[in-house]
UniProtKB/Swiss-Prot annotation:
Catalysed reaction equations from the record: (1S,2S)-OPC-8 + NADP(+) = (9S,13S,15Z)-12-oxophyto-10,15-dienoate + NADPH + H(+)
Protein name (Swiss-Prot/TrEMBL): 12-oxophytodienoate reductase 3
Pfam families reported for this sequence: Oxidored_FMN
GO cellular component terms attached to this protein's record: peroxisome
Family from the record: Belongs to the NADH:flavin oxidoreductase/NADH oxidase family.
UniProt xrefs under Gene3D superfamilies: Aldolase class I
Motif (Microbody targeting signal): 394-396
Main function: Specifically cleaves olefinic bonds in cyclic enones. Involved in the biosynthesis of jasmonic acid (JA) and perhaps in biosynthesis or metabolism of other oxylipin signaling moleclules. It is required for the spatial and temporal regulation of JA levels during dehiscence of anthers, promoting the stomium degeneration program. In vitro, reduces 9S,13S-12-oxophytodienoic acid (9S,13S-OPDA) and 9R,13R-OPDA to 9S,13S-OPC-8:0 and 9R,13R-OPC-8:0, respectively.
Tissue distribution of the protein: Expressed in roots and to a lower extent in leaves and flowers.
Chain residues that bind FMN: 31-33, 64, 106, 237, 321, 342-343
Subcellular location as annotated: Peroxisome
Amino acid sequence: MASSAQDGNNPLFSPYKMGKFNLSHRVVLAPMTRCRALNNIPQAALGEYYEQRATAGGFLITEGTMISPTSAGFPHVPGIFTKEQVREWKKIVDVVHAKGAVIFCQLWHVGRASHEVYQPAGAAPISSTEKPISNRWRILMPDGTHGIYPKPRAIGTYEISQVVEDYRRSALNAIEAGFDGIEIHGAHGYLIDQFLKDGINDRTDEYGGSLANRCKFITQVVQAVVSAIGADRVGVRVSPAIDHLDAMDSNPLSLGLAVVERLNKIQLHSGSKLAYLHVTQPRYVAYGQTEAGRLGSEEEEARLMRTLRNAYQGTFICSGGYTRELGIEAVAQGDADLVSYGRLFISNPDLVMRIKLNAPLNKYNRKTFYTQDPVVGYTDYPFLQGNGSNGPLSRL
């Protein structure tokens, strides 16, 4: 093992410079949908939630945030496309900054992973394809029940530029709200991933068919956002080997390398590195199911992650079921610069301190992941020794 519990040499607690941002540790809050933004407006409870998980020199990535009225696939997720949303996000960002943390907003369009109930005028969700997500999966409905994903509408070639513009405008809105940067969600079977994966994308235009064509949409989105706010404020998340929501690809490694190649070129042409590349490892748990994708063994997973890590010229964040020990190992072995934690951060608002001390962890309650209660299962998980978000143990 790379480090003992409290030997002072825990690599997760070595400082790191992520471009223009100086981080005091390498434990990152992963973006996680929590469904507490009533009517798509960030609420005060979100401020408390993120403040609880903020540490001086820490790095937080928000839950997936809608870039347009067509981009929702869960009830009560926040948006960043209206003035009111920007205004309410600014209150949350200010609270996080007061704790000395860095925070990025994850820009999200779910594509076909939606339902008419979430779409303006009850329209069909847009996607790269007309193929619906299979009945293996269910969508969470506003009333808490689970429904079947409907048939999407394949977006017209002429419409794609507007979606790219939605990403660009949302990135500018995020900066207006005070965010330090944004993360483009290109993973987990959502819209960008629906263009990337050959198991979904069946287009015959310039956005489908060849690997180069399937990478065109994500390239245009990244270029547009970089031109708007600067490369050093932009992170990108991808999951080439994950088949969540039927997002399968015949050659995940080639796909991942193709995306990395394009990100490296964007960095070269912009004269500045992106903030980071955030990759979810193949073994990923979502909705209580483990999705191993096409790569199942630990050896295969490690090979894919290391290949992408070595190919990408910049900060590399790994994600997906990491424990304290696996996070230490990833950084110590050079497999990642930063490690993002999801479910462990839900039930342990002071996860950073718990990892530092190798303290016991609270268990999470999956039943409260996607409810609208602003307290239960959201901001009521206990801190070490009963300290609140401003207690001495929550500060590093």
